[in-house]
């Protein structure tokens, strides 16, 4: 009798798996909304932990379906709603896709104003992650340090808590649109490459060797000297420094090396 009950629970509970991409996640949202499956959760197939009481179903990424969902979010909910979802997604939280799916179902049913109901568990599950990612993005927009390499390519390495590469790519493709640059996340072996026309993200394990441009060597020397001279010993406040710039980020800063 117990085995039959367990079997029924397992067969009736479906979870969707996707390829880890934002488009893959939105495809799952589409399928969950229009199919009869009514999945209990959506998970990245590469990090999914098998559940005895759930039947996984892999959903192939469909760009047309994901585009429809993205468009529906913007048109029926709001751009703010969409940006919250994007930021939350790049937190890489294990349950983030499930949280997003449930919030979207709630939002499409009740309207765009639900994003303001931050005390609601379906809303806070996404908004809290989005805000954490957004704070770190804002920090790195002013914190990343590009080095000019011989050949004119600008290179930056950093180690964020969240997956900031796609978010910073969007910012710097406008800010530094006339330069060729690479932003390298050393924690994830991931980088965004920009060639003055478009950017793309790929796996990247770093440069085997590189030579700094002569002008860059001079700049780094001047910057370190400047930082040393303004840090008057009596006024050095490590606690305050850490509050503005967490120490875990220091090793990638020119002035801290």
Regions found by a protein language model. Name each.
Residues 2-61:
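N-terminal ordered "arm"
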Residues 14-21, 57, 121, 153-164, ...:
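Conserved aromatic-histidine-acidic binding/catalytic patches
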Residues 24-35, 101-109, 170-174, 220-228:
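Short, hydrophobic/amphipathic alpha-helical patches that form generic packing surfaces
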Residues 43-138:
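Charged, alpha-helical interface segments at or near domain boundaries
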Residues 60-65, 199-211:
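Acidic, Ser/Thr-rich peripheral helices and adjacent loops at domain boundaries
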Residues 83-88, 187, 236-242:
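Short coil/turn segments at secondary-structure boundaries
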Residues 113-203:
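Internal, well-folded beta-alpha domain core
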Residues 180, 191-192, 196, 211-257:
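Long, compositionally biased intrinsically disordered terminal regions
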